[in-house]
Amino acid sequence: MPDPNELNANQSSLSRFAFNIYGALNQAQSLEGNSSASPTPSMNPKQHNKSGTSSSNKEKLVYNCEREVSCISQFNHSLNGLVKNYEEDPLHHLIIGGKNYLKLLAMNNDQTKIVHEVDILESSKSIYSSSRTLSSNKLTSVNTIESQHDTIACELATGLISVYKVQNNGKCKLVRKYSDHIRCVNSLDFINQSNVANSSSPYQLISGSQDGTIKLWDLRSASNKPTLTISSNSHSDPVRSCQYSPHSTVRNKLTILSVHDSGALCKYDLRSPNGGYQHNINVPERKWNFHTGPALSLNIHPEKEYVITGGRDQKVCIWNYGDSPTHQNKISPDYMINTYGPVMKIRWSVYPDNIPSKTDTSSSQYQQILESKRYDDKTSSNERETISTMSSVGKNDPLFNYDFACSFLNEDPTISIYNLKRKYIPKEVISSNSNKPFQNFMWAQNISHSRRVWTISKSNQFMSYDLDTAQSDPNIIKPLDNLTSVSMAWNSGLGDFCFVNQEKDEFESISQLENDSFRSESEEYDPEFALASDGSGLASNSGMEDHPTDERSLKYRISSNSLDNSSIYNNHSKITVASIPIASNASNTPLSYQNPSFSNSVSPPFEQTTKPSLHRSATHNPMIQPPKPLSSILQNRSSVGIEALMEHGNNNSGSNSASVSGNHLRPTLNRNHSQSTQGSNVSLSSSIQGYQAPPPVSKRVISVNHPSPYIVPLSLPLPQNDEHAFEILSNNYLITVNDGLSLIDVCLYNANIAAGVNKFRDCQTWRVLAVSLEEDKFSLINYEENIRSQFEKAETAITYGSLDTYENNSNTSNSKTQLNQTNDNRSILSELDNFVGSFNSNSTSTSNYGGVHSEKDTSNNIELSNANNNGSRKASFSEIKPLSNLNSPSHLKDVLNQSRSNSNSPVISRSNSMLLKNRKTINTGSTRAENHESAIDDDDGMGNAKTCELNENDSQFGMKNSELKKHSSMSAIDSEAIDNDFPYNIESAKASPIKIGSQHKHEKNTTSGSMSPQNKDSNHRGNIINYQRRLSLDPENSRKNSRNAFNYRHTNTWDLDDENSNIIGNRAQWATNSSLSSCGVSSYQPRIGSPNYSDQLHHSYSSTHSSPRPYYNSTTPGSSRRNSHISPVHGFHNKTSYAKQSPVSQKLMRDEQSRTELKDVQEQIEDLESIEETKVTSVNFGKSELTRAITGNNTGSPNTLYKPWKTEYLLKEALEFASLQGDILLCSILTILFYDYLKVGKDSHVFSKEQSLDWLSLYVEILHRKQLFSNAMYVVNMAPKELLPDLANLASTEVNLRFFCCWCQKLLVNEKSKRKALNEDSFGYWYCDECSTKQSNCIYCDEPCKGLNIVTSLSCGHRGHFGCLREWFIDQENIVCPGGCDEQVI
């Protein structure tokens, strides 16, 4: 099981690979290697063993130095007098130098142990103690060490160079000291014709110093002066590194390369034309400027004239410094690699990759597979030739066979190993064991020829790393193994969507397409290399070393290389267009590696038949005409035949002179290796007369038979990828709540914007969020009102209990008339309460069912509303306008508009619990009005018909009483005001005979819900009831006073979803229970969820239906009432008649009655707090569950109640869907708007802070990609404050700009001017140090153009400041250049 910490470190390291930023793994590992007896802060010297090794990795060597060390080198000389008891003398040892520190560490053969230590400083003192000059060993700091054979040279920070000789027994002596340099020496190198370990001792030494000079020293001379000095005439450019080139001796030259602080690479030839050496060289032979900053290191390739340089500009450049004219005229490096940090040191590997080591099994296994296939009887001759070429292909490209390593500045504890085959990703990354930066490193020579790196870190620790056994070393990581082989991108410029694919074992190499005459002068002709480069089937395989080891891949390669035209030409019936190889060009192929032109192909040297052209990568040659397109041939396919198709696939000449039918295939010519000439490079199918020798072209290819890496662009018709819609939405969406708007208004506005670009789902999402926000707003208001109403319950009950105003109020005739309002435009279907039809539907308006609704009613309602508004602000039912039709499409919109218009009204801001409490108190108050009631005497001679009419009027009053209950959402004061306005006319009461009836008769007949003739005395009503009866008997009077009536029906709650399927049964049960309630009996309904719900429901139902059927129809229009377990006459005392008491007694009884009723109210408060049970049993009986939940669940806290339509739940679903669909725009806009609303990071579960940051950063990146920079900046500025710091860091990107001189066209580095400029002065690229001229001033103001505010004219080339040119062209409306050149720009 891998370590999770290690996996996290690996994943974090992959982020450095973006934009060619490589390296990784800042991880500290425990020290598990062997060490010397040197004391360190983390290790005890007594616990170390000099020759001990780590138990986990026996190949790893660790040594801790006593002092600060800074440089390292390898001593390749035998120490047989010091190291004994070995079959072979160890030849490779270690030298470490530092501050007053210079040691030689002798190793065993496999370099896993340090067997002896030699202090060079102490040894040299004992030998030359009598010498006054040579015994001075007051070292300060060893800066560089170089060794060859038995000679060691070290240079100090003071400029002193010391040369030592080492004997076989380890004794050292100081032989030379050179002190001609005046500053620190940065580089040393020996000059020898044969740079091998067993050669004779070197006799020449070069040194490069910070004083800007390179000096040549003759070790054989007794003089301490240099033989030759190289310096610059213009200025002293410090030399960072210099090296002798061993490859230039073939041309009898002595070449030295150096890199300087100016970033220049200089090439010097020390030989004079007359022989010998030049004494002083001031001008280099060649000079290249590859780096924009100081170049810090260089190293020459072991086999070819290529040099690699690294600098502070985070670039690695590879350049051919040979004398070939092809390379002399180049101004850019052959290869350039971007690194993630400034390069401090860079070195080529001493061994190529194709040399198998003892631990390398993949290479040997691959060779075994090749050999087994080569001598297999089933293998054809063509396949054998292919295998033979593939076996030798690895040693034909030395530039690609060598790795190179680089270390970095800025405290980076890594060393990256690269190869040009996969130059953008390092092969290995070495991390420091102590998490300290590396001070120095080198490639170590060893007898096993393995890739081994020696390092020293700033923790003064030496460590050896074997890259061939990296699997067992936790400090060596291969990033390529952790990367995917497929990458993709949206809107990359090639298409809506594109992806790049490349196998991990496919590496680059160089193959020359041309003949041998165009090779570099320094290259010797290699027949095998010519074979690989000239063969069309093998050109793509040159330089291949990392072969796949599986047999299936090998079989694929062999079969791909052995294709011939016989399968096409002999099977004419099976030929298809897809099987014909077609040349691709730059116009129709989006690949960075295009297929080669067919005129460059040559015949394979090992085949007699013509092969079809293989699809391989090459550089397109514009000098050669492409072949005729296939489409023109296919149009004439019927007349031309199959021969034209064959010619199109094999005719590589590109000649347009011959017709399609006229050119026939020419016989194939065998080409021997010795016959490689310029003329033999002609294509087989081309015309000799039209042949022209192509210019020299080289190409970089992949070692496979298909283009690699290849890119696949796609154009996908995705609605979410609409560029026009994206731009409109990003420009017009509101992402902040402006002044005068609310979040609801912003959502509705964004909904209209989304609908404008046919984003209807997004439009609906915004609208739903707007409705949910409004619902949350009213829920919060109702909750706050409920909290405040708890303190008014007792006072409200007392207020409604004291109804003395009924006795003294004589101005209530108009209010009395209002209770008789029954003229509402209800349809017959509305009897089912929205089961079918609408509540206020006018579908039956022609029948005038339910009475005629006159226009005067509306006017009177408006007058009453205005009258109420003139006085103190009291809620009246006329303030709420009834809706016309619930089934209309605009019903929901009307509901939303009405709720908005009345959001400040206390009528709609009350909770349902308050409705019940106020309704109960109103019922209680209505019973107290019976202190002065009079019952209708049954002795007045009224018949049964009249009694029935009276009972019907009672039913109508019961309806009105129920309507009053429905509208008891008013405050206590408002309800009291309406109760005080109830009509009580004494004169009208005396017009009819009254008599106080017996209450016992009433109780006996309450279950029937009707009034029989024998029980007409038992209906105990007051003056209000009598007045109602008289109005019902006088229709004219009813119509006369109906204009003052209230229209209460609009406050009913409606079933918006129309899903109550059992409404008929509920209405039947409600009718019976309502009749019971109208008679003063509490009809108890069982509560849903109670333990005895089933039994109680059965008992209630059976007791209700066992009674006689009522005389009148309870479902008569206008008699709709809500059932309640609280009786309308709750608290009414039996056998009590206030009319027979004295006024004082009546007053006392009323007060006592009020106190009793107050006690009863307080006892029932708990029952009324249970909203869900109360709604089911009393308030919302007959509604669906969804309607009850929407309209009634308002008593709890809005934050604790679960409502699926709450904003946070709807927003969560919308964000999840948008993120799955890839709609980053919607996710980002919702995040900005609702981040503070949901309090993300505190108690929100909709989205996290990390998700918000990801959405916004990706949205800003997309805006940058689409060049909507102003929108991106606006999004960053409007982001939540918590995300703004992180988002600003992600959105900001560094831009590297290079400026070139407008006169000499050279790069403006200006290092010299920078050093002269003061720290407080701002330095701009307006002056060129190379040509010592100032750049062009602004053409308008004639001031220097500094910074980025420069605009260049498209035609005349003049430039100026942005503000100046804007003033000239826009403000002054000019169209020509302000420089007077009369060039029309606009």
Curated annotation (Swiss-Prot):
Transmembrane segments: none annotated. Residues 31-58, 595-629, 647-691, 844-958, 991-1021, 1090-1157 are annotated as: Disordered. It is found in: Vacuole. One of its GO terms (biological process) is positive regulation of TORC1 signaling. A zinc finger (RING-type) spans 1338-1381. One of its GO terms (cellular component) is vacuolar membrane. Pfam families: WD40. The keyword DNA-binding does not apply. PROSITE patterns: WD_REPEATS_1, WD_REPEATS_2, WD_REPEATS_REGION, ZF_RING_2. Coiled coil: none annotated. Residues 1148-1157 have a biased composition (Basic and acidic residues). Belongs to the WD repeat RTC1 family. This is Restriction of telomere capping protein 1. It comes from Debaryomyces hansenii (strain ATCC 36239 / CBS 767 / BCRC 21394 / JCM 1990 / NBRC 0083 / IGC 2968).
